[in-house]
Regions:
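Polar, S/T/G-rich
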Residues: 1-250, 349-367, 374-389, 399, ...
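Surface-exposed loop/edge segments in extracytoplasmic proteins
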Residues: 11-13, 79-82, 306-317
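Extended, low-complexity, turn-rich repeat/linker tracts enriched in Gly/Pro/Ser/Thr and Asp/Glu
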Residues: 284-296, 348-351
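Short, surface-exposed beta-strand/strand-loop-strand elements in extracellular ectodomains
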Residues: 293-308
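Extracellular carbohydrate recognition and processing domains
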Residues: 309-331
């Protein structure tokens, strides 16, 4: 007995056979897909069915019932063949509604269609700020699982050098590296999907990142406070703590005084009102010693109650010089409630001091560019998923409300075995060749310039099948770009310092007035895929402001594991067991509703009469009739 529940209502249905098609990733088609669907069903236009469909067959009634999806449950003899499917009213012919339904596995692909990676909420996490202190923290972290990062590489902008066994990294144009594992988690969360699989738990997957060219950083500052001195200040020795700290007194809405207690009563440290990144700019209008002879060294900078900031000071050797308009900047992260002051002291001798005039202390809050449209290039999610599935040979199998991502090796070598020998009826069709492949199959990445593609050719590979029936060649390409073959090498440095070369920028040099001006032109939308790799090399991380920050290790972008030769060896090694002298069989089996209910495409079917194990691709099921099963022999 066939039962069809549409939006929870038992539909009137004639007990006629109809086909329910079940299929998974077609191993003869490199483009991954999965969907299970019914053929057209003719439902009588009874009062019950007309009510289910909102009387859509009455043109005078305003209704969108014909243009929406319906929840579908399909039972045979009380056994659920499909639960939570989605159905559509296709039309009406005579006294029958034409209805079709599908497994909700299609919803993932429908969800991905038309969506861009830039639309994912939470794509930019706390690690996504291009700040030297943030990048230093990332570099020293040993756990970046599901977090974005900044990876050291040669992006074509001359931002990296090696001197004396130390990387010098200018981060001005460094692109954001996006955790691919986190992207999948965000899709699952937003789409209310459940993704599972050993591959998704692997270190390989958690180490995988993507990054795009054509990014724009545009940090903005908002002025918080500008304070100035109004007198000459004798700078005291460093041991006099209370006399080396300078605070602020509000004169009016537009004016703050910089001085210290007790000379000026009421001065107080600046209290941070909102957590975030701040920049302090200090200008010393004039600095000189207070003695006609001797030498001294003055220090100036900031002090914070936040232990992660502490005191940040710069030295100024005075001697007999008078210094004018000395300017320095300090960047740091401050929490709400932190207190900030200015510090000035004399470091060397008690009897030689320093005098400063016209000091300006400016605090700005830095608002990072969180406009994802300028930080990340366009990338359709459907293309991203398709590329990832193709790179890793993944088949997503939907069962019991969950998507489990299986690699080809898992399906061929680890899937549970089911014995259908007793249900075998006959072979309906046997094919000995797969026209979806060729004698030579090229697995390719995109190239920066097709005419110079040989400069990136080492990332491509090929697979051969000995079958004279096949065409000579087919190309299978993914949407990611490969790096250059040759890595960036540094003079007087070992190969341990070599970096991947990715052309995110092109270098342009122009000679103007006898001087060479260098600019870097952004390339558009070049997505790359790579792994993060920890390299224990000292690194100085620099931006356009202040001194660099030193770290003892750094994360670098490594594409080695994404060479197609590596991918074919790791994820496609079992393809030969299917396609060397293939036997693609469509056979009839006497399957009942319990067989269909218990069946999983993550299975290997054993058929004694056919002499071995088979990987299932498609099943055409009709209640009360034999089922057609398309499968390929595992050699």
């Amino acid at each position: 007995m066939i039962e069809l529940y549409i939006n929870g209502v038992v539909a009137d249905i004639e007990q006629k056979q109809f086909t329910y098609n079940m299929q998974v990733n077609d191993m003869f088609d490199f483009d991954t897909r999965e969907v299970s669907y019914s053929d057209s069903i003719y439902l009588p236009a009874t009062a019950t069915n007309r009510n289910i469909f909102g009387f859509a067959d009455v043109p005078s009634i305003m209704s969108d019932s014909a243009y929406k999806g319906y929840s579908v449950d399909y039972y045979v003899n009380g056994i659920p063949i499909l639960q939570g499917g989605v159905g559509y009213l296709m039309g009406k012919r005579g006294d029958y509604f034409i209805f079709e339904f599908k497994d909700v596995s299609i919803l993932l692909y429908q969800y991905l269609q038309g969506r861009d990676i830039k639309g994912l909420k939470g794509l930019l996490d706390d690690n996504s700020r291009r700040d030297k202190r943030n990048i230093a923290n990332i570099s020293e972290s040993d756990n970046l699982d599901y977090k974005n990062a900044f990876m050291l590489a040669d992006y074509g902008d001359d931002s990296v050098n090696v001197l004396g066994g130390t990387y010098y990294w200018q981060i001005l144009r460094t692109p954001l590296s996006i955790s691919l594992a986190n992207v999948f988690n965000l899709v699952a969360s937003e789409g209310r999907f459940t993704f599972k699989g050993n591959f998704l738990r692997s270190e390989y997957w958690k180490n995988t990142y993507i990054s795009s060219s054509n990014i724009t950083y545009k940090d903005e500052e908002s002025l918080i406070l500008t304070a100035k001195t109004n007198r000459k200040i004798r700078v005291n020795h460093e041991n006099s703590y209370s006399n080396r700290v300078y605070d602020f007194l509000k004169i009016n809405d537009n004016e703050w005084l910089l001085d210290k207690y007790p000379e000026v009563s009421g001065t107080m440290p600046f209290v941070v009102k909102e957590s975030g990144y701040y920049r302090v700019s200090i200008t010393l209008g004039k600095v000189y010693r207070n003695s006609s002879s001797g030498e001294t060294s003055m220090r100036y900078g900031i002090g914070s109650t936040n232990s992660n900031v502490g005191e940040q000071l710069k030295n100024l050797n005075i001697y007999s010089n008078t210094w004018d308009n000395i300017t320095s900047s300090f960047e740091f992260y401050a929490n709400k409630g932190d207190m900030i002051s200015m510090i000035m002291d004399v470091k060397d001798y008690y009897y030689v001091g320093a005098v400063v005039e016209n000091v300006t202390f400016k605090i700005e809050k830095i608002k990072s560019n969180d406009d994802i449209n300028t930080l990340v290039s366009d990338l359709q999610l459907i293309d991203l998923f398709r590329n990832v599935f193709n790179i890793f040979g993944i088949t997503p199998i939907y069962e019991r409300g969950e998507y489990t991502f299986y690699t080809l090796s898992e399906r061929v070598e680890e899937a549970p075995m089911i014995d259908w020998s007793g249900k075998f009826v006959k072979i309906k069709e046997l094919k000995f060749h797969s026209s979806e492949y060729a004698k030579k199959n090229n697995f390719l990445y995109k190239k920066y310039d097709d005419e110079r593609g040989y400069l990136q050719s080492e990332w491509d590979s090929r697979m051969f099948f000995s079958d004279e029936v096949l065409v000579d060649r087919k190309d299978f390409s993914v949407g990611f770009y490969s790096p250059f073959n040759e890595r960036r090498k540094f003079e007087n440095s070992s190969s341990d310092f070599d970096l991947e070369r990715m052309e995110f920028f092109s270098k342009e040099e122009k000679i103007e007035n006898g001087f060479t001006n260098t600019s870097y032109k952004e390339k558009t939308g070049r997505w790359h895929i790579f792994s993060k790799e920890k390299r224990n090399k000292p690194t100085i991380i620099r931006d356009t402001v202040g001194n660099g920050i030193g770290v003892s290790s750094v994360w670098v972008a490594s594409s080695e594991r994404f060479k197609w030769s590596e991918l074919l060896r790791n994820y496609y090694k079992t393809l030969h067991r299917l396609l060397d002298r293939p036997k693609i069989i469509t056979a009839e089996f006497a399957l009942n509703e319990i067989d269909i209910y218990e069946f999983s495409f993550f299975s290997r079917i054993y058929v004694e009469q056919l002499g071995g194990y088979f990987l299932p691709n498609k099943i055409k099921y009709k209640a009360g009739a034999v089922a057609e099963v398309e499968m390929i022999k595992i050699n």
